[in-house]
Amino acid sequence: MIQIEHLHKSYGKGSETNEALHDINLTIESGEVFGILGSSGAGKSSLVRCMNLLERPTSGKIIIDGNDITEVKDKELAKVRTNIGMIFQNFSLFQQRTVLRNVTFPLELNHTPKKKREERANYLLDLVGLKDFANRYPSQLSGGQQQRVAIARALANNPSIMLCDEATSALDSTTTAQILNLLSKINRELNVTLVIITHSLAVARNICDRVAMIDGGRIVELGDTDTLFANPQSDILRTLIADEKQENHRAKPTNKSANASTNEATNTPKNALNNEVK
């Protein structure tokens, strides 16, 4: 379980102080897929960086399985982070390492014996559908394949939590659907708690059990995904839903090919949990 209590994060000093997060309070249950939804500049990235202490909060607590990680000293951070995997929009792979050696990298840092780390990496590559890609390099992979390598690497230390920071923003709609399907599979089969940071209503709608809407560094709305989207209470969420409807109307398919593409792109976890990730 993740409990965030009265979290504040400010940048700068004195008159130049900018409060990025104001009194954030959240409880994320173990095994949940929890979405943090917001527009650019809303505070999403600041929150996720505080959650794994890439940045320390100005005040407040982040309690994971009963332990307040904000009290951990810098020299002990590496141990805390082994329990928190993270993937990013830009994949962040090592271009000079093979796919296999990208996945083994966190295990190398933990001094895991070579045989065990390669066994773990090969298992994870099979899990994400890349068992035949171990000796390739990132430059030889598509964007979706690179993100799957990043997912495998994030799982290397068998974390109980994975933070996904705009993990599908650089991908097309079809590949996004495939990656969301994979993340849902990981959540179900490995019982990994997923925290999905996104600006996309479609992503939140299709994978998240619950969603917190963040705006101006504050949680303005929180609840079950379907209920929240059916009956939004905040101005920002109502505006985003209205904008989405308008955009969908403008992009309405005009032929069978477009309809087929739309159906494929919306074949996300809640609609197609059993589909194989290509």
Regions found by a protein language model. Give the residues of each.
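ABC family nucleotide-binding domain
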Residues: I2-I4, H8-C208, A212-G216, V220, ...
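C-terminal boundary and immediately downstream tail of ABC-type ATPase nucleotide-binding domains
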Residues: A230-N259, N263, N267, N271-K278
